């Protein structure tokens, strides 16, 4: 079964989901979430604080162990609002690469919305008809 890992570095928390494709459906193998408050200082000062960076790196290292344990074939790491706005985002993405080997993809707000929509309509029962989707993200 092909196994995939998705990591979301958000403004308030980091999330990990590892899933395998089985009979044309995703089967969740592992999930994790850590509140890191990456965006808290960004929205006040324009930069990611050293404390938020360290908290996020700790979470990502834990996620990395889970990804290795589940032998994910593909890993996608995305970052959202706080990373789009932070003046020191590039330095932080280098730290992530150094700590985990992962490249962080800082996605646009439009791509973020597209991915949220795709996740809801492909996994939520009843989401294929008319519905309203509201993203209450941290950024």
Residue ranges of predicted features:
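Nucleotide/phosphate-binding catalytic cleft detector across ATP-hydrolyzing
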Residues: 1-9, 17-134
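Conserved Rossmann-like nucleotide-cofactor binding loop
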Residues: 12-14, 139
């Amino acid at each position: 079964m092909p196994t995939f890992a998705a990591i979301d570095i958000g403004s308030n928390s980091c999330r990990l989901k590892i899933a395998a494709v089985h009979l044309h459906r995703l089967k969740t193998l592992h999930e994790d979430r850590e509140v890191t408050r990456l965006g808290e200082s960004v929205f006040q000062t324009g930069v990611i604080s050293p404390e938020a960076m360290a908290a996020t790196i700790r979470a990502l290292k834990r996620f990395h162990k889970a990804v290795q344990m589940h032998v994910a074939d593909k890993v996608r790491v995305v970052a959202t609002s706080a990373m789009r706005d932070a003046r020191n985002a590039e330095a932080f993405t280098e730290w992530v690469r150094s700590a985990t080997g992962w490249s962080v993809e800082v996605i646009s707000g439009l791509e973020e919305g597209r991915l949220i929509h795709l996740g809801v309509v492909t996994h939520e029962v009843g989401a294929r008809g008319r519905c309203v989707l509201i993203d209450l993200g941290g950024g």
